[in-house]
Amino acid sequence: MKTKESRFHIHDELTAPEGSLPILKGALSTGGQLSNFLGVLAGSPAVLRAYARFRSELRHGELPLKSQQRIALAVAQHQGSEYWLNTLQRSAREAGLGLDEIALAREFDSRDHAEMVLLRYAKALVTTPGAAPPMHLHEEAREAGWTDEQILETVAHVSLSLFSTLVTRSGDVPRDG
């Protein structure tokens, strides 16, 4: 059976450019397996470093992990990224989201009012490129209890998710495992 091949080379610690090795070794040191996505990014040390730094900084932000997962699921669904939908289904469950919330998040929705409002804001970012989200969505997010810091992090998570889906789609990156 022929397996799907990526348009980009999927590197590991033996084939990656030297500038990518510190990040790859760090990822492998956690005992996990290197994802195909990181293997592709390793082809450009600058891109891998930028992604790793951006993601690392956002992990230390104020946006709850469940919110981050919901945003990533919604963007992956909107962008049609099977790679990320497969990966995020697992990580969302590990973050404590139930199957019902995962399904809702994929549609920019949630049973939790505050999360639903934030996802509507994220949806406006994704579906109206070149335009600011309507002011009422920004105001609704604030009224739902989201701070400016969390709203800015939402914008950042949307951009990180868009970048991730663009890489996997443009490279036709096969699912892990």
Give names to the regions the model predicted.
Residues 1-177:
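Hydrophobic alpha-helical segments
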